[in-house]
Design a protein with these regions (language model features):
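Generic beta-structure capping elements
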Residues: 32, 114-116, 173
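The catalytic-center signature of Zn2+-dependent metalloproteases
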Residues: 144-213
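Bacterial N-terminal signal peptides
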Residues: 1-13
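Metzincin-family zinc-dependent endopeptidase catalytic domain
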Residues: 39-155, 161
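Acidic/histidine-rich, surface-exposed loop or edge segments in extracytoplasmic proteins
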Residues: 22-37, 130-132
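Cleaved targeting-peptide boundary
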Residues: 11-26
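Residue-level signal for beta-strand positions within conserved beta-sheet cores that form or flank
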Residues: 25, 58, 166
Length: 213
């Protein structure tokens, strides 16, 4: 079985940002790319995450922190931090994402996603598709497409630190079948989990991302 592990543990001007001025979201995620930098990656990640969350009533917004003074300010209650690391996890190459979660009373804010793990998984999936043992939809998955469910998974760890793993995006391990479902637009968060996330967000009004906020 092809799988990777998701783990939880106790830039240009604003006009080029993935989150437009004046937009609203439940959480704003500051993105720091470590290693190889790609201006387009955060934009594409925003689109991919929005597609996965379409119809859920949940909105996550991203800001590319490369060269952005706003990212030097202290975090607000509605902000999280995502590190996109170019290589593999230092001790486990199958770990694609980690969330440094807190407690229900003091939730964590930091998650790391390892692009090297995503690339490794992508190559394995392409091999399965080319050998005709899996659907060719796997050949169409982009890096951002594959990053999106991992990032959403880690966000859940941060916002619901005591939540046991479940179905869909919230599985502890995604296998080839799940990546095919992603490619077919069928991999989602479960309805119950979505409701619990919305309950977390309802504790405060949505953020408005405006210049000089």
């Amino acid at each position: 079985m092809l799988s990777f592990v998701l783990v939880a543990m106790l830039a240009g001007p604003f006009g080029e940002q993935p989150t437009p001025l004046g937009s609203k979201s439940d959480r704003l995620i500051r993105v720091y790319q470590q290693g190889v930098y790609s201006r387009e990656l955060v934009l594409n990640l925003q689109r991919a995450v929005s597609r996965l969350l379409d119809g859920s009533g949940i909105a996550l917004a991203f800001i590319d922190c490369e060269g952005q003074p706003i990212c030097n300010e202290g975090l607000r209650r509605d902000e999280l931090v995502l590190r996109l690391v170019s290589g593999l996890h230092p001790t486990d190459s199958t770990t694609c994402g980690m969330a440094f979660r807190g407690t229900p009373g003091r939730p964590g804010v930091l998650m790391s996603v390892y692009r090297g793990c995503v690339l490794k998984t992508s190559k394995q999936l392409r091999g399965l598709a080319l050998s005709r043992t899996r659907s060719t939809v796997l050949l169409e998955l982009t890096e951002a497409d594959m990053l999106a469910p991992i990032v959403i998974h880690e966000v859940v760890h941060l916002l619901l630190p005591g939540e046991a793993h479940g179905l869909g995006i919230w599985q502890a391990v995604l296998a080839a079948d799940d990546w095919e479902r992603l490619g077919n637009g069928e991999l989602k968060l479960g309805a119950d989990l979505t409701s619990r996330l919305r309950a977390v967000f309802s504790a405060q009004a949505p953020a408005t991302h405006a210049e000089g906020r």
